[in-house]
């Protein structure tokens, strides 16, 4: 009896896979799933897992995997179709009879599937040493070429002759999406002079092809047209291979191209699929979420990749919840996933996965990074855009979390910057004309020594001041002289003025010691100032400035060549955010201290 493919989905939805499995396996509940001894290989420790929510089984030992129908097929030895009939009978699920129209549709589908299998055999037979060499130069091994059934469609009429010899007509080839017709009526092979890559559905049936041009020519990549067996909005390249790994890891990685998938699978990342050069659809997302809770988008690091990310974000926001997640791998500009793993290695790509960013963080980076928010209108527009994203989230709890996240980001990145201006009259460094921020900080450290020499009693502070490398050499000489007098010669702070007057450092001493000098705010000169807060603020501001300068240096032109560079960039980003947050807390503490003591 022929079943409609849609009926398979009915069975998956109607029958709990755990109910079927436990007839053959003793299952134990664990973390929302079930575990037991695998029925397909000998083992002493349970490695066989079953998930009703994912409607899937997977063995970590022998890698057996599939849905409830596949399990029945593996246990009984029946075909997939016959296993579905058995399940329907056992569980009282009515099997709908096919209408005449449906019978004709599925007969046509079977015919097309058979033709596509024949086409793939032909394409594989046409691989030449030149084509194999081209693929090998792209780091695709002969084993991978065989695994993915990569072939070649030659020029000329060999393709048409192959099928005509089998009594397959041009009409049939056209329905299978293998030939086209020119304006003059001439029939031509759609993939002529292209490397062919078969596209398989979830059942491992070839439903179409992708073609990659050899040499120059446009389009570089070409997909089969949509047919009764191939709809781009439903199909993901590599899905038949990825589903087991996605279930095991609880995430899928979504890329753009065939060779991205092939290279990543070859490198061991078998949870990768591609969207066949078309926009991601809701069907794609739901299909991937059935295999794992998280979808990781890894798109090219160019403007087109960013635009594709924005489209996917807007599509996904109404669908996400605590169990359906989207995250992103940000590739350096000019790098695609294929390059990332072939040029930089497996460890580099693993690190990219481990350091992926959340959907909320991706939205923030898209809306904030590289833009100026000098006016109230700029900031209002940012807030409006972020609220628009949040409003699309259906899950109320998640929507509230996104609001809080964006509010925190605005506070950390915009409000605290405004506080630099507001707090100039309270506790921040004056923005003195003619001095860089680094020079202001260096002068502030020396001014602090003159005003509060007792800080040198703290060992860590004394060591920091002693080892500080000044950009201003005159200031460094003054530091050395001052510390020598205070520490080595035990000169009292009150006696320094008389001594320095006889040296070449008198002018700089006067500049640094005046109560309203350029380098310490008047708030610092109060008798009841909190020295601990003051020192921490200056030290962290100096540290942050050096972090920012080093980060700007290593990210120049956004070129990341190896995993060490990537880890270094990641460290600086995290450390900068951490210190900036600590400075914000110190700002507030200092302001509160000043206010309390002014009452």
Swiss-Prot record:
Entry keywords, A to Z: DNA replication, DNA-binding, DNA-directed RNA polymerase, Magnesium, Metal-binding, Nucleotidyltransferase, Primosome, Transcription, Transferase, Zinc, Zinc-finger
Bound cofactor: record note: Binds 1 zinc ion per monomer.
Coiled coil: none
Highest taxon, organism lineage: Bacteria
Keyword DNA-binding: yes
Residues engaged in binding Mg(2+) 1: 256, 300
Binding site for Mg(2+) 2: 300, 302
Catalytic activity: ssDNA + n NTP = ssDNA/pppN(pN)n-1 hybrid + (n-1) diphosphate
Positions annotated as zinc finger (CHC2-type): 38-62
GO molecular function (one): zinc ion binding
Any one GO cellular component localisation term in the record: primosome complex
The keyword Metal-binding belongs to this UniProt entry's keyword annotation: yes
Domain Toprim: 250-332
Enzyme class (EC, first level): transferase
Required cofactor names: Zn(2+); Mg(2+)
Pfam families: DNAG_N (PF08275), Toprim_2 (PF13155), Zn_ribbon_DnaG (PF01807)
Biological processes per GO annotation: DNA replication, synthesis of primer
Entry EC number(s): 2.7.7.101
Function: RNA polymerase that catalyzes the synthesis of short RNA molecules used as primers for DNA polymerase during DNA replication.
Family per similarity comment: Belongs to the DnaG primase family.
Subunit structure: Monomer. Interacts with DnaB.
Comment on protein domains: Contains an N-terminal zinc-binding domain, a central core domain that contains the primase activity, and a C-terminal DnaB-binding domain.
HAMAP family: DNA_primase_DnaG (MF_00974)
Protein name, entry field: DNA primase
Organism: Rickettsia bellii (strain RML369-C)
């Amino acid at each position: 009896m022929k079943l409609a493919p849609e009926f398979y989905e009915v069975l998956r939805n109607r029958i709990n896979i755990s109910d079927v499995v436990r007839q053959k396996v003793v299952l134990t509940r664990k973390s929302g799933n079930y575990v037991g001894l695998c029925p397909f290989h000998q083992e002493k420790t349970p490695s066989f897992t079953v998930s009703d929510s994912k409607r899937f089984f997977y063995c970590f030992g022998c890698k057996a995997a599939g849905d409830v129908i596949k399990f029945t097929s593996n246990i009984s030895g029946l075909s997939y179709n016959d296993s579905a009939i058995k399940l329907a009978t056992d569980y009282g699920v009515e099997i709908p009879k096919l209408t005449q129209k449906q019978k004709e549709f599925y007969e046509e589908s079977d015919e097309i599937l058979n033709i596509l299998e024949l086409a793939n055999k032909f394409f594989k037979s046409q691989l030449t040493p030149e084509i194999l060499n081209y693929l090998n130069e792209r780091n695709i091994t002969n084993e991978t070429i065989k695994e993915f059934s990569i072939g070649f469609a030659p020029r000329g009429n060999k393709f048409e002759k192959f099928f005509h010899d089998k009594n397959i007509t041009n009409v049939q080839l056209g329905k299978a999406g293998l030939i086209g017709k020119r304006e003059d009526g001439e029939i031509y092979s759609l993939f002529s002079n292209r490397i062919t890559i078969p596209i398989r559905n979830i059942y491992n049936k070839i439903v179409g092809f992708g073609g990659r041009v050899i040499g120059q020519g446009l389009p570089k990549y070409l997909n089969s047209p949509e047919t009764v067996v191939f709809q781009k909005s439903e199909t993901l390249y590599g899905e038949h291979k990825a589903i087991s790994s996605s279930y095991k890891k609880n995430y899928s990685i979504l890329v753009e191209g065939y060779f991205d998938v092939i290279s990543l699978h070859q490198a061991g990342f078998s949870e990768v699929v591609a969207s066949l050069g078309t926009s991601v659809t809701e069907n794609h997302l739901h299909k991937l979420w059935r295999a794992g809770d998280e979808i990781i988008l890894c798109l090219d690091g160019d403007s087109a990749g960013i635009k594709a990310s924005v489209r996917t974000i807007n599509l996904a926001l109404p669908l996400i919840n605590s169990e359906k997640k989207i995250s992103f791998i940000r590739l350096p500009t000019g790098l695609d996933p294929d390059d990332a793993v072939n040029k930089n290695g497996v460890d580099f790509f693993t690190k990219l996965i481990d350091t992926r960013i959340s959907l909320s963080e991706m939205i923030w980076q898209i809306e904030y990074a590289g833009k100026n928010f000098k006016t109230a209108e700029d900031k209002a527009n940012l807030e409006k855009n972020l609220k628009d994203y949040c409003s699309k989230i259906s899950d109320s709890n998640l929507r509230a979390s996104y609001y809080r996240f964006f509010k925190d980001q605005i506070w950390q990145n915009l409000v605290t910057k405004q506080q630099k201006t507001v707090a100039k009259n309270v506790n921040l460094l004056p923005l003195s004309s003619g001095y860089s921020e680094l020079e202001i900080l260096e002068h502030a450290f020396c001014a602090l020594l003159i005003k509060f020499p007792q800080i040198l009693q703290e060992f860590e502070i004394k060591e920091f001041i002693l080892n500080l490398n000044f950009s201003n050499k005159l200031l460094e000489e003054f530091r050395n002289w001052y510390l020598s007098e205070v520490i080595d010669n035990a000169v009292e702070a009150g006696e320094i003025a008389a001594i320095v007057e006889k040296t070449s450092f008198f002018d700089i001493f006067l500049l640094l010691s005046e109560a309203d000098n350029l380098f310490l705010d008047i708030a610092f000169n109060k008798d009841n100032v909190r020295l601990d807060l003051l020192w921490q603020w200056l030290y962290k501001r100096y540290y942050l400035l050096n972090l920012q300068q080093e980060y700007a240096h290593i990210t120049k032109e956004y070129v990341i060549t190896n995993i060490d560079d990537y880890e270094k960039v990641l460290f600086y980003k995290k450390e900068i955010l951490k210190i900036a947050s600590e400075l914000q807390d110190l700002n507030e503490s200092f302001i509160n201290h000043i206010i309390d003591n002014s009452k």
